[in-house]
Amino acid sequence: MHLEAARVIFFLWIFLQVQGIKDLSIKIYGSEIKDIDNAPRTEATKNTAKTYKVSTMRRIFDLAKHRTKRSAFFPTGVKVCPQESMEQILASLQAYYRLRVCQEAVWEAYRIFLDRLPEPGEYQDWVSVCQQETFCLFDIGKNFSNSQEHLDLLQQRMKQRNFLERKDEVVTKETLGELGQTPGLQQTLPVSHPGPCLSLPMTTAQRNPQLHPSRTPRVPTRERKIEFTDAAEDALEQKVELSISLANQKFKSELDNSQSPYYLEVAAKSQLQMQKIFKKLPGFKEIHVSGFRPKKERDGTSSTEMQLTAIFKKGKAEAKSPASDPLSLDSNKIESEGDPRGTTEEEKQRELYPTASELRKLISRALEEDQSLDVGTIQFTDEIVGSLPSLDPDTQLVLPTLLTDITKDATLSPELPLGQPRLETVDRAGHSPPGASPTDGWSPPAMTSTSLSETLPFFTASSVFPQTDQSATDIMSIDQTVLIPRLTVPTDDYSAISPLVPEISHLPTSSEDWLSTSSQDTMEYLDGVDLTKTPTSSEGPRNSVGMFPAWIIFLENITPDPGLRYITTSAMTVAARGRELVVFFSLRVANVPFSTDLFNKSSLEYQALEQRFTQLLVPNLRSNLTGFKQLEILNFRNGSVIVNSKVRFAKSVPYNLTKAVRGVLEDFRSTAAQQLDLEIDSYSLDVEPADQADPCKFLACGEFAQCVRNEWTEEAECRCRSGTQALVLPIEDCEDIPGKGTPCRSLDQSKNQVYEPGVKKFQRQQDNKVTMKRKFELLTIGYEEFNYQDWEGN
């Protein structure tokens, strides 16, 4: 009994001890959470809490040991590789920090002081200077605030505010200031030179040049001493003076007085409206309204002609910089890497600012496309030598020296209607046609089948073109063939015209100048002349030699129209005269064998391969290139398989067209090699814009045919050589029929060698057209289903 009582007491004591320790642990842990900073702890409490924490950290550490080890990425975008040392990591972070700070500083300077986006070249210059610590950050802002562009911008804003607030007051000419001057800012403005920057300790990148190669500091090309002089302005700017007629705006007498409130109100509104149109043009700075004057239209009504002066930036040859490569504002690159497909220095300079002729084309196109203005005619002042205002509608221009610069190679044919210009081959080397001596006069037939009316439309803005020195003007380049449309000259007094043609002893030897300035300006106006609407007249012969319509001036310097030239910058590509952009490209597929059926566009193999490349290329071009319109597979050539194609785009695109197409094709080549089992030779990629490409290079003609290029339309076509004739017309649609030779055959072949009678051949052509139409409809339906499935899959 006594033993059992002792055992019970022993177990009870053990139970109480265990329970007390447990309560003590809970109390210590609770007090630690509540009073972790203020409550005093005993040594036992500290040891217990430490044991508890260590065990928790050990459990977390044990779990972390089972995770996969990977490289650390900083949220800034700098990747830290495991093999880098601590000094290299710090150097990379510091360099990236300096780059981002400089990018933001320069970007904000352009946005705040100049209110525009920077050009890639100047942006890179300033970022490089900032990274090299040539300027302190705040000195960059001081330089921008004292720049001429910023002061001109302030002057422009002040003028706009004065026009709106004080339009009811009479403002003197001295208050407004003369055009090109800055009132109140004529004195030389002191520019604060950069003070001594705080010398930072030498970083790891400076101690180790191999980690971060140093660059030579390039100070941006900016005026240190700003003076508003004509010389400095002419060196940095170019002015374009033009006048536009507003057909629906009647002229009021108040517009004659430049100090009247009505004049100031109209000028302010017109200036703001023109700024909205012109700000889209590259290099535009400002525009001013020079004045208004009345103009009498051809129908007798009166309209208003507004004179404008637009100021653009002008690129200089010495402003070229090796750092003019475009820089992405979100780029993480610390060092500039050269682009293996980069443009040359000349191309970079050409991409900065357009030339004077390109500006005129851009301005004309922008005004014509704007719907807010009813623009009648556009005339540039620098193109006018003499002005004949207020012409009577029935009065025609008298140009006594109109045909002074006609070359001997220009052939005038009286036998072709004006609506169908004939293509004539002309030798640029200066040789006379066979059977004609250099001194022979022009002796056309006595009667002409088509004549011109005396009331033909001519240019609204009249011009007088003086006779120019033949030796000082490059008319044509040598050793090239151009195509000239024949025209009918409406006169019977041929003896009077013949003495007007000067004798040309030589032609220019330059093969680079395609045209002279006068012909370039003239052809811009010919774009708006519709020769097919020319009326015919049966009136008698004319008495005056000079009574020719003004569009005949294109016979002066008969060089082909250069209107297809594209205006290309780093941020846009624009086709001149409102045409669509065209790019030719070719690529070679190495692992596809070539067969003779690919010469025949009607063969199933040709159509299948054409459909395959169309389905592969069109989605890539459409999704990656804004303004894409059409892809045309021109032909397949031997050499494994060489695919020649033509891509059509809109009139203007917001990127460099050639670079963008090449980039898309490079991506397509990589994708085709990985997913489609197509080995495209990277060295075979050839991308050429239509204004620089030779269309005959991408057009395959037959053995007895030759490629002929129309210099006006920039289109190429196959034509039979002399002594041959076409089997099927048009020749460009002919195919090599297996077993039946080439599309053209010699004329000396016997009639027994004719392949088919005329009736059967015509019937076969019609059957082929119907078959091709059905196949094309089936291919179109299949291609639409393919696009729909591809869209749903995405």
Curated annotation (Swiss-Prot):
Q: Which InterPro entries match?
A: IMPG, SEA_dom, SEA_dom_sf
Q: Name one GO molecular function term.
A: heparin binding
Top-level taxon in the UniProt lineage: Eukaryota
Residue ranges for the region (Disordered) are 202-221, 314-355, 413-449
Instruction: Give the Polar residues compositional bias ranges.
Output: 202-213
User: Could you confirm whether the keyword Nucleotide-binding appears in this record?
Assistant: no
The positions flagged as glycosylation sites are T425, T439, S443, T448, T450, N624, N656
Q: Where is the composition biased (Basic and acidic residues)?
A: 332-351
Boundaries of every SEA domain copy: 236-357, 579-692
| Biological-process GO terms, alphabetical | visual perception
Q: Where is this motif: Heparin- and hyaluronan-binding?
A: 629-637
In what way is this protein post-translationally modified? Highly glycosylated (N- and O-linked carbohydrates and sialic acid).
Q: Which UniProt keywords apply?
A: Cell projection, Extracellular matrix, Glycoprotein, Heparin-binding, Hyaluronic acid, Receptor, Repeat, Secreted, Sialic acid, Signal
Segment forming the signal sequence: 1-20
Entry coiled-coil feature ranges: none
Question: What Gene Ontology terms describe where this protein resides (cellular component)?
Answer: extracellular region; interphotoreceptor matrix; photoreceptor inner segment; photoreceptor outer segment
Report the SUPFAM superfamilies cross-referenced here.
SEA domain
Primary localization class, coarse = other
Q: Where in the cell is it found?
A: Cell projection, Cilium, Photoreceptor outer segment; Secreted, Extracellular space, Extracellular matrix, Interphotoreceptor matrix; Photoreceptor inner segment
PANTHER family under this entry?
A: INTERPHOTORECEPTOR MATRIX PROTEOGLYCAN (PTHR12199), INTERPHOTORECEPTOR MATRIX PROTEOGLYCAN 1 (PTHR12199:SF3)
Chain's role: Chondroitin sulfate-, heparin- and hyaluronan-binding protein. May serve to form a basic macromolecular scaffold comprising the insoluble interphotoreceptor matrix.
Name listed for the protein in its UniProt record: Interphotoreceptor matrix proteoglycan 1
- Organism source for this protein? Bos taurus (Bovine)
